[in-house]
């Protein structure tokens, strides 16, 4: 149920960038929607939490969503970069998904999630 990870960069201890390939065969695309499949927002949040709790904030878990904005759909076959930034002092995880269009990146979604122990 997770995407194929192409590359991972962690330029700082509290920040990670993960390049993902959205395989059209992913479970999340089935039935969402028949005419044009797209990656549901719940999957995007699930993946952000998956990587955050393993790479940046082990021992922390989901508390609530402070804000989230879905700006453009993520389609099957897309290459995207998931950027996660962890601010432990504020217990806040910031995430963004950027869709790759050649050398250009377009923000598809972003948000802030509050974590707790």
Predicted regions and their residues:
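Catalytic strand-loop segment that frames the active site of acyl-thioester-processing enzymes
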Residues: 1-39
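Acidic, aromatic-enriched beta-alpha/helix-loop junctions
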Residues: 34-46, 50, 54-55
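Hydrophobic residues in beta-strands and at strand termini
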Residues: 20-22, 70, 115
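Hydrophobic beta-strand-centered segment that forms part of the acyl-chain substrate-binding groove
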Residues: 49-83, 88
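A generic structural signal for short beta-strands and their flanking turns/coil linkers
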Residues: 14-18, 29, 61-66, 78-80, ...
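HotDog/MaoC-like acyl-thioester-processing domains
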Residues: 4, 11-15, 85-117
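Aromatic side chains
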Residues: 29, 33, 70, 95-97
């Amino acid at each position: 149920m997770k995407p194929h990870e192409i590359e991972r960069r962690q330029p700082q201890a509290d920040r990670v960038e993960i390049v993902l390939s959205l395989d059209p065969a992913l479970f999340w695309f089935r039935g969402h929607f028949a005419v044009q499949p797209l990656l549901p927002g719940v999957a995007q949040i699930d993946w952000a939490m998956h990587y955050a709790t393993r790479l940046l904030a082990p021992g922390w878990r989901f508390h609530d969503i402070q804000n989230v904005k879905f700006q453009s759909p993520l389609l099957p076959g897309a290459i995207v970069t998931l950027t996660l930034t962890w601010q432990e002092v504020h217990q806040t995880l910031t995430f963004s998904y950027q869709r790759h269009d050649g050398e250009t990146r377009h923000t598809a979604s972003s948000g802030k999630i509050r974590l707790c122990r």
